[in-house]
Amino acid sequence: MRIAIDIRSLTDERMTGVGVYTLNLVTALAELAPQHEFVLFASGSRGVLERLPNFKASNIKIVRLNLPNRLLFLLLKLPGGPKLESFLPERPDVWIFPKFNLFKTALPYFLTVHDLAFEIFPQFVTFKEQLHNLLVGVHQVTDQAQGILAVSESTAADLRTRWGVEADKISITPLGVDGQLFQAREQPSDKAYRATYDLNRPYILALATQEPRKNLESVIEGYELFRAQGGETLPLVLVGAQGWKTGALKELIERSAFKNDILELGYIPDKHKPALYRGATVFVWPSFYEGFGLPVLEAMACGVPVITSATSSLPEIVGTAGLLIDPFNVNDVVSALHQITEPQRGADLRKQLGAQASMRAQNFNWRHTAQATIAALNKLTSTSSNGNK
């Protein structure tokens, strides 16, 4: 089977969660299914295309369309405009689209749906993203897909209950984590990476883009109450790119009585993340809603105790290997921080949760993601072929 995959997300200047998924899925698919040919499609200006990673597998071919994405967008929207497969040297059997992106095709395709945050919490989505979804026609492309790849049971449930997508059309393809990169064992380079950010003692870590949905305000408020109530004098380290509507967050930090202990590192290279996870006493992630929650899984793989939300997909990821809280109740954050740093019993709890988290994270790897994806393609393309006989 010749499988075309849209890898335009890999041309972003900074790797996003969708980019991490796309990169690892392609790599795992090529290794798992050498009998299939994978044709990767990307578009953009020459400088943009240079950001693409190198894929070494012999069953991978990359098609680079040297055309600005805005121009491609307009071409695809034109009545009678080109189909994406017209830019490929050979006609594929099926497409995989790893996100809601503008495309036009006459071929069967599988669409990965990460979450429905834009519909469930529209107040947490930028106007630009809402406009993008409108132009893409997210309902229509979902309806017309041969199959839907949902990254969690939670996302699958949202698709069924909110959009009426038939259960038989949905396959659960959970994301994975690189067990070689994200592991509990301290690495020789860890201290040097942490020293880059002047992190020479334990800390509380929160890693997320600064945007409303990530609920970092509750991290700040919870930390301040925790410290005011006599909690351990651990600094709070915030890692993540600037998003949007950060004014309230910045104001909370500036007003905090403990602002000198709140460190904003901004965006950091991916290769530094494992060292920062491993140096943390606890990882805090009280997001309001997640389709999956990859940073939580990464922290777990590094053996870090996790405090996260008892909402959406996060209980699926964490199970009993972390502390689940109500993201709408800041006192839950405070209570969990006290529980996990408590002088007498906290150390035992951290050791227990860290070991459980590391063990549970082993259930999530990119090979499993690829296996579930291939199974979905085989099942639904076979069903379609039989139906056409």
Placement of each model-derived feature along the sequence:
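Carbohydrate transferase catalytic cores enriched for Leloir-type hexosyltransferases
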Residues: 1-389
